[in-house]
Amino acid sequence: SILLQSGLFGLGPPCSIAINFEDAETRKQASVKRESGQTELVPLFHGQDTVAGEVRIEPLPGKKIEHTGVKIELIGQIELFFDRGNFYDFTSLVRELDIPGEISQRKIYPFEFQNVEMQYESYNGVNVRLRYILRVTVSRNYSSNIVKEKDFWVRNILKEPEINNTIKMEVGIEDCLHIEFEYNKSKYHLKDVVIGKIYFLLVRIKIKHMELEIRRRESTGSGPNTYNESETLAKYEVMDGAPVR
């Protein structure tokens, strides 16, 4: 297949393909960090949303495209970075846009995927990526298929849990340091505030400062092929120096 991009020596695709969402101007966008380190804004959807818009195919001047059909797919897939090139598709929906024929001038195809079941949230991790894409394929008999992809982001909003217990834990070093901490609840939303208390029950060592970190833990694979990663998302200094009464 030819993935649409600028071709060298005239070997590029004979047309341009654009995938546009019908509510692109009003729909919220998510900021996504790519492997290159650059940040990109992509349309944000929620589970059970309708994904609709149009596909524009425009042949290059003087070109015409003979094809055996045009289709658009909505795909949800998981890619493990230690198994690159292999994708697990957990959602795959198809809409046929055109029957076999010829495209000699710009054609616009509307598409709609109603109330799509998108139960998993998009995720870009250290070792795994879960993504949703729209993929347009112009199938051809004697030449490579022409393929265009467009990413979108899925974030699901859950109801606030009826039961949200506090967290209490005790940690320390035997006969040297004994602390107890408490958080006001065990489940938080993305814009929540973490409120808690830390009690120093025993201090027999010198303390320079105390920090609170928010970490994201990621576990991929299974059994002996399990990969664990931890990433610090935020760090706060909550105490400078030793605790005093």
Language-model-derived ranges and their functions:
Residues 1-245:
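C-terminal beta-sandwich interaction modules and adjacent acidic
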